[in-house]
Curated annotation (Swiss-Prot):
It comes from the Bacteria. Keywords: ATP-binding, Chaperone, Nucleotide-binding, Phosphoprotein, Stress response. The modification Phosphothreonine is found at residue 200. It comes from Neisseria meningitidis serogroup A / serotype 4A (strain DSM 15465 / Z2491). Induction: By stress conditions e.g. heat shock. Residues 628-642 have a biased composition (Acidic residues). The keyword Isomerase does not apply. One of its GO terms (molecular function) is unfolded protein binding. Acts as a chaperone. Residues 608-621 have a biased composition (Low complexity). The gene is dnaK. This is Chaperone protein DnaK. Pfam families: HSP70 (PF00012). The lineage of its organism: Bacteria, Pseudomonadati, Pseudomonadota, Betaproteobacteria, Neisseriales.
Length: 642
């Protein structure tokens, strides 16, 4: 059976794990790290960097280095959250033809799924390197509070990366899975998973039950905020530094993308340091300059100051906890364990707020960076048939329904309904002799249709003429295990039906996905060629260096014609490595190797002679030492003190 890998596709960092024979392992990336920054850089010449290499060059390539693309996934350009991010991001966010928020880098228009696919591809390659076989299937996690458009867009990202996404599961559910399977006991427990990541916040109340040796994970309720996370905490600190610097120097750093990128790195580092220390210093020399010369930024930030800057963000995470508990029909006293997930949950003030709300100390034995990927890998092993001792019952985070007369939303599936699920309801026409109806699918909790998220619409035509209210139109909502919605409508009088899988009024079309898959495959081929070119160039340069050194040491022992031949081959090889033609580099390196063969023989002969001379000298020295040995008389001394 093919291996199904588990991927936590995070806003700030991503993580990869695999589960085999009941054992789960987090897999290191090409740089040897267990997590990969979700940062993608587009360079001149078409090269794409992902992860730490992309992050390292961000300051000098701010406009073409994309981070936190997950915050844009499945979003319209006009969404207020996107508009808020436009002001703080150094790269350009644009409006796509379908109204979605896309990104522009190196003159190319890129969709968020396309950008996220680069991270997924890096994960896929790391898994293949570890397993030594091709990987095509994955379980990918998403925030529990992701709507249908965002889930669909995440699946699209997987396809573009060459992965068949077997299941989309919610991040808190995955973390609970990792926690529950790690516990050897058979105790039933109710857990609250507080997941404050880089860009999103989720809270899920999950019941872990032991059923004859198998474990059932049932999500009782979930809530959250898809625009609340570590990036927002960083931004508060960045805004504060910018304001203070403006007061002191009269210069607005918001206008300088390079300064913004340096500030982002410094703020992230300061935030991490303040989780263990009471104070940190931000030092950014030459941050900018004006007519009077260069300006330096030096500022002390205390933990108390930082906490005051983000106080309301922490408070914002507590309200969804209250709602989730209420929806689950539980009180804080019913919760056995509180699990913290996501890097931002390491902040002491966040932990204090969680402890105060739930009335108990959150558990510290769950790795907040890796638990989600581990849970995804466990679910991957279940789906591949590798284990059957786990049953996962997840829920839909938001209510689903259609727009009905008067612009109201009529709900067919309530939030926190266990999935997969199906629901049907009969509707009718609003006018006499109406020949068609438009089914407008919505997701959200508001009564007014326009206040909810529009997922898409479709028409059911050829309705037989009849007075209003007479035709019977049955609308069926069907949510699969990924939380993705399929909607159908049927005229019960004529039997005519229409249906769609919701891809949202936004989202990528099938043609766009196919094109992006082809682009990605072409890119993979380009990457392979680049790797081969670099390897050839490195080998050639090593040979050039070696020949030059040997020529300097032994060149005077060669006849003039031989030396000239080597120097000519050297020059040609040096010219070749400056170019990008792998064939030419290989050919010139081979020619240099042939031309310098005699020189190589000379170096080898000299080395042999030196080695033999060394051995002779050592033998002589050893013999001399033997001659110097003096026989000595000795007598045994008895120790009377014993």
């Amino acid at each position: 059976m093919a291996k199904v890998i588990g991927i936590d596709l995070g806003t700030t960092n991503s993580c990869l794990a695999i589960s085999e024979n009941g054992q789960t392992k987090v897999i290191e990336n090409a740089e040897g790290a267990r997590t990969t920054p979700s940062v993608i850089a587009y360079l001149d010449g078409g090269e794409i960097l992902v992860g730490a290499p992309a992050k390292r060059q961000a300051v000098t390539n701010a406009k073409n280095t994309i981070y936190a693309a997950k915050r844009l996934i499945g979003h319209k350009f006009e969404d207020k959250e996107v508009q808020r991010d436009i002001e703080s991001m150094p790269f350009e966010i644009i409006k796509a033809n379908n109204g979605d928020a896309w990104v522009k880098a190196q003159g190319k228009e890129l969709s968020p799924p396309q950008i996220s696919a680069e991270v997924l591809r890096k994960m896929k390659e790391a898994a293949e390197a570890y397993l030594g076989e091709k990987v095509t299937e994955a379980v990918i996690t998403v925030p529990a509070y992701f709507n249908d458009s965002q889930r669909q867009a995440t699946k699209d990202a997987g396809r573009i990366a060459g992965l068949d996404v077997k299941r989309i599961i919610n991040e808190p559910t995955a973390a609970a899975l990792a926690f529950g399977m790690d516990k050897g006991d058979n105790k039933d427990r109710k857990v609250a998973v507080y997941d404050l990541g880089g860009g999103t916040f989720d809270i899920s109340i999950i019941e872990i039950a032991n059923l004859d040796g198998d474990k059932q994970f049932e999500v009782l309720a979930t809530n959250g905020d898809t625009f609340l996370g570590g990036e927002d905490f960083d931004q508060r600190l960045i805004d504060y530094i910018i304001d203070e610097f403006k007061k002191e120097q009269g210069i607005d750093l918001k206008q300088d993308v390079m300064a913004l990128q340096r500030l982002k790195e410094a703020a992230e580092k300061a935030k991490i340091e303040l989780s263990s220390g009471q104070q940190t210093e931000i030092n950014l020399p030459y941050i900018t300059m004006d007519a009077t010369g260069p300006k330096h930024l030096a500022m002390k930030i205390t933990r108390a100051k930082f906490e005051s800057l983000v106080e309301d963000l922490i408070a914002r995470s507590i309200e969804p906890c209250r709602t989730a508990l209420k929806d689950a029909g539980l009180s804080t006293g019913d919760i056995d364990d509180v699990i913290l997930v996501g890097g931002q949950s390491r902040m002491p003030k966040v932990q204090e707020a969680v402890r105060d709300f739930f009335g108990k100390e959150p558990r510290k034995d769950v790795n907040p960076d890796e638990a989600v990927a581990v849970g995804a890998a466990i679910q991957g092993e279940v789906l591949s048939g590798g284990r059957s001792d786990v049953l996962l019952l997840d829920v839909t985070p938001l209510s689903l329904g259609i727009e009905t007369m008067g612009g109201v939303m009529t709900k067919l599936i309530q939030k926190n309904t266990t999935i997969p699920t199906k629901a049907s309801q009969v509707f009718s026409t609003a006018e006499d002799n109406q020949s068609a109806v438009t089914i407008h699918v919505l997701q959200g909790e508001r009564e007014r249709a326009s206040a909810n998220k529009s997922l898409g619409q479709f028409n059911l035509g050829d309705i037989a003429p009849a007075p209003r209210g007479m035709p019977q139109i049955e609308v069926t909502f069907d949510i699969d295990a990924n939380g993705i919605l399929h909607v159908s409508a049927k005229d019960k009088g004529t039997g005519k039906a229409a249906n769609i899988t919701i891809q949202g009024s936004s989202g990528l079309s099938e043609e766009e996905i196919e094109r992006m898959v082809k682009d990605a495959e072409a890119n993979a081929e380009e990457d392979k060629k680049l790797t081969e070119l670099v390897a050839s160039r490195n080998q050639a340069e090593a040979l050039i260096h070696s020949v030059k050194k040997s020529l300097a040491d032994y060149g005077d022992k060669l006849d003039a014609a031989e030396k000239e031949k080597i120097e000519a081959a050297l020059k040609e090889a040096e010219e070749a490595v400056k170019g990008d033609d792998k064939t030419a580099i290989d050919a010139k390196a081979e020619a240099l190797g042939t031309a310098s063969q005699k020189l190589g023989e000379m170096v080898y002969a000299q080395a042999q002679a030196e080695a033999q001379a060394g051995e002779g000298a050592q033998a002589e020295s050893s013999a001399k030492k033997d001659d110097d040995i003096v026989d000595a008389d000795f007598e045994e001394v008895k120790d009377d003190k014993k």
